[in-house]
Amino acid sequence: MKFFALFIYRPVATILLSVAITLCGILGFRMLPVAPLPQVDFPVIMVSASLPSASPETMASSVATPLERSLGRIAGVSEMTSSSSLGSTRIILQFDFDRDINGAARDVQAAINAAQSLLPSGMPSRPTYRKANPSDAPIMILTLTSDTYSQGELYDFASTQLAPTISQIDGVGDVDVGGSSLPAVRVGLNPQALFNQGVSLDDVRTAISNANVRKPQGALEDGTHRWQIQTNDELKTAAEYQPLIIHYNNGGAVRLGDVATVTDSVQDVRNAGMTNAKPAILLMIRKLPEANIIQTVDSIRARLPELQSTIPAAIDLQIAQDRSPTIRASLEEVEQTLIISVALVILVVFLFLRSGRATIIPAVAVPVSLIGTFAAMYLCGFSLNNLSLMALTIATGFVVDDAIVVLENIARHLEAGMKPLQAALQGTREVGFTVLSMSLSLVAVFLPLLLMGGLPGRLLREFAVTLSVAIGISLLVSLTLTPMMCGWMLKASKPREQKRLRGFGRVLVALQQGYGKSLKWVLNHTRLVGVVLLGTIALNIWLYISIPKTFFPEQDTGVLMGGIQADQSISFQAMRGKLQDFMKIIRDDPAVDNVTGFTGGSRVNSGMMFITLKPRDERSETAQQIIDRLRVKLAKEPGANLFLMAVQDIRVGGRQANASYQYTLLSDDLPALREWEPKIRKKLATLPELADVNSDQQDNGAEMNLVYDRDTMARLGIDVQAANSLLNNAFGQRQISTIYQPMNQYKVVMEVDPRYTQDISALEKMFVINNEGKAIPLSYFAKWQPANAPLSVNHQGLSAASTISFNLPTGKSLSDASAAIDRAMTQLGVPSTVRGSFAGTAQVFQETMNSQVILIIAAIATVYIVLGILYESYVHPLTILSTLPSAGVGALLALELFNAPFSLIALIGIMLLIGIVKKNAIMMVDFALEAQRHGNLTPQEAIFQACLLRFRPIMMTTLAALFGALPLVLSGGDGSELRQPLGITIVGGLVMSQLLTLYTTPVVYLFFDRLRLRFSRKPKQAVTE
């Protein structure tokens, strides 16, 4: 009593307290960062190593394996995967959430150093690492195009000037430059001319290497001067290499230009990048795992004018893709939804109380509670994201509930003729415990979420804390500001005011009377109600088992990502043509705004594409509908497949896959893995629950297998090293010398001119100079035949691995796909030597599925404990919790009706319903117990009176929560796919719960009261005050 009086009779202090809360909230709001979702990125580090021209199998055995054995000893590594392709190895380390990425980076560097002695000596550089996840979609893509500069020159500007500067910006984790390679002098040899002149490829390599030397020459001094010695020992352009003498034949000089075509070109000609059909260099920017995407993008944009000024005016630097506009648009939609929810719940109050003065009170209380929450969010290190703003949107219905309960009870006393200040004090005292019970039991729902680990726990933590803080501030406001405003603002109703909205008042009275009549009938047919209650429990179980499930709703971020997978024997020229064909098909789609893509490098039969869709208000289709439409057109392109997927804000794992979900096969028996992977992949491709099934196992690449006759080689005076050096010189784009420039270093690359390598007969033109100086054709001591070879070798941990990726067709859920895959594996009879498991997002979904039921049970148990403590009773909490089955049925039926799978967002809705629907029962039970204690009423009379007395606040609080969630259901635009499942779940649960709990709660109350009396040895008062 004294606590409430302290605030009611000191209005200035109470107002200033509320102002202080509001001001702190405004300051917090201004400093909160913006993000699409809470920070849930796993710490990921990528280790890269290269050995030019080495086969994938060589890279896997000699580079990947030693590194994996060393890196695998690092503490906190949750997953280690590697992929080795032609000349390169990439190892992805994913760490536990609580692992500091900077500390992990130091451990990675130490592990690389420890493995250095086990790596091949011919590696051009030590392995490097980067704190970025290569499987993440870029947060921004910049393109460089020019009508005057070559692709190599554009790449040089991008990698030498732009990429290092961008990498220094806070939040940037990796800048990947694609579309070409660094400038180089390329030497294209003519095998026949070399043979005619008696010059070996090693002779050419040695001559070029010796002619381009950068060594210190020293200085000369006399008594007064010092001269630095400088020579023309370096050759920098193709024109300078052309006249280089590489051999003398019969007294005549053989110059490089006589046996080769020397050009200013690029290090690797098998690279191509495009933007909207125009050749381009791409800078793909990825953020650090812990970085904020909006802040990082804004920082990059702020530096763009400076970056533009560092490159020639003839180079056009453009933003081809930017993730931030759709994120901002989504947050704007949520903010609008929040404002609409606040307006609707205030309208509910106005309709029920029919008083402008009374409506002002929640109109003040709700904003104070919500705005004050921003201060706590800032102190907790949270961000303004879709989930935290959805929490505030839902909180509008909760925070107004507290104000409604207090306000309605005070208004009831005023209508009975009590003076305002007395009514405020008496009304608040009567419902203070009720408000406290409702708030604490609602916060208790989220305690299990705060203890939940892994990605789901990280994802839901901000939602739970934000909502809990809003409820806590609302509790404070409803017991301080609300009664004070009631005491000083409200007056006894006058006849003129009571006539307002008479129609709605009559409807409410009629509803209350009809409810009273129906409740009497129900209380005389309690067995029937018991059957209904048991039926809802059984229906809950059946609906939960049968409803389709997924991890997270499929988002439409306005960005698509596509992986091209072509025939494994395809040439680079044909692959570049496929890229152009696919880009034309996509560019012609009316919903597409921009297309960029690249191919080449170590994976000759693959490429990547990034598609920016038009804004949501300029297209009628969702991203998935656009993918479905394009899939039909793309399937007509022979010899290659383009797998499209919508970029999501949540992507787990470091695998660069061509689809959203992965299923990984592991085996220590590599032949068994290569035998069973095609069988499993083909079986999965036939399943209707899966789409775009593909695999990273690339073991059918075309190979020319050379077999040396070692006896013949020994007789001819040729060793294996000389023969291998010949092949590397001829076909390996061998980097044989370095050109030093002020800003960068460039290479001299030697190989047989592509004009002479158009077919297998090129091997017949190769020869080796033996130890007697004679030219011995390769065909004299080697035979060759075509064979198959892997284009990539993949590991997970230390086991060989193949990952099958898949998307979901429209209308199918991840639970459908998971069950179908499990059935297929059983039907195939896969041996125990090949182990299959879900990976990435699909793995997290499996883990979440296993914990969902436990989480719900834990939430119910926590609420029971809190209510039991508050009521000092084992029984009354069960009465209150009996409201939950009907809410669960309503939520699951609503999801089925809207064809929405049960996701993590829907789980949040179920958790919220546990907190919402019990409020009705709390209000009934509180007043029934009060009537039994002080009114000397029987339990049936007490609960009947409590139901009628609390009918109006029950309707008000339920409609307030309903209208608070309704804008989420009806919202469209960016991010609506996240908001709608939450709204659908809450609205469905509230509607069904309201229809049933008004009748089931009184029946359960009476049932437990009779049960208590039957098993009690002596009568005991139900609740001690």
From Swiss-Prot:
* SUPFAM superfamilies in UniProt: Multidrug efflux transporter AcrB pore domain, PN1, PN2, PC1 and PC2 subdomains (SSF82693), Multidrug efflux transporter AcrB TolC docking domain, DN and DC subdomains (SSF82714), Multidrug efflux transporter AcrB transmembrane domain (SSF82866)
Alphabetic keyword roster: Cell inner membrane, Cell membrane, Membrane, Transmembrane, Transmembrane helix, Transport
Q: Where in the cell is it found?
A: Cell inner membrane
| Upregulating conditions | The mdtABC operon is transcriptionally activated by BaeR.
Recorded GO CC terms: plasma membrane
Q: Where are the transmembrane segments?
A: 3-23, 333-353, 360-380, 387-407, 431-451, 463-483, 528-548, 853-873, 875-895, 897-917, 953-973, 984-1004
UniProt membrane topology term: Multi-pass membrane protein
GO MF terms listed in the record are:
xenobiotic transmembrane transporter activity
- Keyword Transmembrane helix in annotation: yes
Give the chief site where it resides: membrane
Recorded hits in InterPro entries, A to Z, give: AcrB_DN_DC_subdom, Acrflvin-R, Multidrug-R_MdtC
Q: Does the keyword Transferase apply?
A: no
Family per similarity comment: Belongs to the resistance-nodulation-cell division (RND) (TC 2.A.6) family. MdtC subfamily.
Its biological purpose = The MdtABC tripartite complex confers resistance against novobiocin and deoxycholate.
User: How is the quaternary structure described?
Assistant: Part of a tripartite efflux system composed of MdtA, MdtB and MdtC. MdtC forms a heteromultimer with MdtB.
Would you tell me the protein name for this molecule? Multidrug resistance protein MdtC
